[in-house]
Amino acid sequence: MGVMTTHESVPTLSLGHASTPGLEIPQIGFGVWEVPDTDVDAAFGRALEIGYRHIDTARIYGNEDGVGRVLGREDVDRDDVFVTTKVWNDDHTNVPAAFDASMGRLGLEVLDLYLIHWPAPEQDVYVDAWTAMLDLQRQGRVRSVGVCNFQVPHLQRLLDETGVLPSINQIELSPYLQQRELRAFHAEHGIVTEAWSPLAVRAGLLDDPVVVELAAKHEVTPAQLVLRWHVELDNVVLTRSVTPARIAENFEIFGFALEDDDLEALAGLDRGTRTGPDPDTFG
């Protein structure tokens, strides 16, 4: 696969809209969903050693304290790490206090990216939450604000009622769930697409014969093949593991490129089915 990846060689994408001008997000991030707080020190610490410079946590994950401990280490340059956290559904009407609590756990004065975790449409207060997020950005407390799991009608409503779209939308995305209509809306409006559950492990994507065959062709693992697919679609992609070897493996996706027929084969895997909750009903 060629030269080993370093953090300096990881590509970045520009965040627009509700962002500090010129803010860049590394295209590969390290997610800590389902990582116990006590395990974050080792996993995130190892990720930093390997070269990750983008960490994704959330209040509901229960491990912001662990992320904060690592960020506070003397050998970690806070300005060198892009930090994301999220507001949970029960705090849509309490965003400033929720933000303060997260910042206290993270030990930060300024956050890079704050996200609404789910639209929770039955509550019907996500526009209020978005307005509060924009206020935090205007106050200089967060460099960029965005959302997770918003569908086109949710995004359109934010635009109609506030005039400002998110800089990024973090969504469930994989070759088995390609969300073409939503990604087209993102592209049209300058919203960065960020993928969670990018490997669709629960759906068996890594054992799919097409993925296995293409991985063998490029002499990479099925996971590396799929993560590379995300990068070539200009997505930000979140990896997740507590296993040192797997953390390293997931980072080594920049030493090869997919061919047009590879992309065509992967495009044909779309099933349109989710492994996670439905954003139109969850929350």
Walk through the language-model features, giving the residues of each.
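Alpha-helical scaffolding within the catalytic cores
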Residues: 6-15, 65, 71-72, 97-101, ...
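A short, structured active-site edge motif that brings together acidic residues
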Residues: 78-91, 112-119, 149, 173
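Beta/alpha (TIM)-barrel catalytic core signal, keyed to glycine-rich beta->alpha loops juxtaposed to Asp/Glu
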Residues: 119-283
